[in-house]
A protein has these predicted regions:
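Catalytic histidine-centered segment of alpha/beta-hydrolase-like enzymes
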Residues: 272-284, 302, 307-313
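Gly/Ala-rich beta-loop-alpha elbow adjacent to hydrolase catalytic centers
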Residues: 158-167
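Short beta-strand/loop motif that positions the catalytic acidic residue
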Residues: 233-235, 240-242, 246
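Short alpha-helix in the alpha/beta-hydrolase fold that links the catalytic acid
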Residues: 106, 236, 250-257
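Alpha/beta-hydrolase active-site loop
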Residues: 132-150, 155
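Conserved alpha/beta-hydrolase
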Residues: 100, 107-129
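Hydrolase active-site cap/lid region
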Residues: 172-220
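An N-terminal hydrophobic leader/cap segment in hydrolases
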Residues: 14-71
Length: 347
């Protein structure tokens, strides 16, 4: 991947400058590939497959400090993971150049709805090991998490950008019935990636050979595993959230795809772009509501009600205690266990 998944195309007054830059880049990489292919590959990997550093905010660091931490191993790279809350989990999958904590706006609303949240830093990102990464490693990270000790708890995924691509690949490969919310997903990933290489001027023969090396290393195929080609095999429900002004991943891709598949729903936003969409409260609420509220939350309300009744029981006089005892038969045993010396009931 590049530092940007999609670049602005050559147009207007910049077209001649753009084409000139492409020719210079093509000449440079062709010469380097002919005379020092190993060096050429290293340069391309460093330029296009090495993510930039994501700087966490104080709020994000506080979330990380208060999470339960665990690790998984992806192709001999340690991947750092965090969990908040209890109950069934929703996995938060970040995109290229991001971090799991980038989706922190979803954590507390998920907990309020009875879910726990699990986030991770993909290989080469954040606190995880590695200097480079790829779509295939993103996919294997999610697949590994779903088969980890925490995997049986995962009920759905909220994924951003390349994380959405990897989520689609995972659901198809594992034949999972997971619900997924894909935010600004790169579903035509091959076209986006190839388009970027063409835009900057990397010769096609060179980047296709490099991608082939990644395919052989990780056991995937860029054409076969292009997310748009996998969607026809997926029957679980998917919600796509995409902004019309996204400068990175074209909104029209999500619109066209959602029109083709009955199990895919599209929620459109405006003026949020590619990243601000992750912090928008209406987007967060739409995503949480898509999974539905867990019964555990209702049980929690009942528990709070029970606690209030118990408190009233402790403070009440003899008549009030007797009435509470008779009105709440399901709580009698609990009342008696609280304070045997004060328990009041029919003799």
């Amino acid at each position: 991947m590049s530092t940007r998944l999609l670049a602005v195309g050559c147009n207007g007054t910049n077209v001649r400058l753009c084409k000139m830059r492409q020719r210079v880049t093509q000449t440079f990489f062709n010469f380097l590939w002919d005379h020092a292919p190993t060096v050429s590959k290293k340069i391309i990997k460093r330029l296009f497959f090495a993510p930039t550093t994501y700087k966490s905010t104080p709020v994000e660091r506080e979330y990380l400090d208060n999470a339960k931490k665990f690790e998984v191993s992806i192709h001999d790279k340690t991947v750092k993971c965090w969990k908040w809350g209890s109950g069934p989990s929703i996995l938060l999958a970040h995109g290229w150049n991001g971090r799991g904590i980038q989706l922190h706006h979803f954590i507390e609303p998920l907990r309020q709805s009875g879910y726990s949240a699990i986030a991770y830093d993909a290989p080469g990102h954040g606190e995880s090991q590695g200097r480079t990464s790829s779509y295939f490693e993103f996919t294997d990270t999610i697949r590994t998490l779903l088969t980890s000790p925490y995997g049986h708890e995962i009920r759905g995924v909220i994924a951003h950008s390349l994380g959405g691509s990897a989520t689609v690949n995972t659901i198809e490969k594992e034949n999972l019935p997971l619900k997924a919310v894909l935010i600004a997903p790169a579903l035509r990933l091959k076209e986006v990636l190839y388009g970027f290489f063409d835009y900057v001027g990397v010769p096609r023969t060179i980047y296709e050979l490099l991608i082939k090396e990644y395919e052989d290393q990780f056991g995937y195929n860029m054409h076969r595993d292009n997310p748009v080609n996998l969607l026809r095999e997926i029957h679980s429900k998917i919600l796509i959230i995409h902004d019309t002004n996204d400068p990175t991943i074209p909104y029209v891709d999500s619109k066209g795809i959602s029109d083709r598949f009955p199990n895919i729903e599209l929620h459109t936003t405006e003026r949020l772009g590619h990243k601000k969409v992750l912090a928008d409260s209406s987007v967060v609420n739409r995503a949480i509501n898509y999974f539905g509220e867990q019964p555990r939350k209702k049980e929690g309300k009942e528990m709070s009600k029970s606690i209030n009744i118990l408190e009233e029981y402790r403070k009440g006089d003899l008549d009030r205690r007797l009435n509470l005892f008779l009105e709440c038969p399901s709580l009698r045993a609990e009342f008696l266990e609280i304070d045997q010396s004060e328990a009041v009931g029919p003799s």
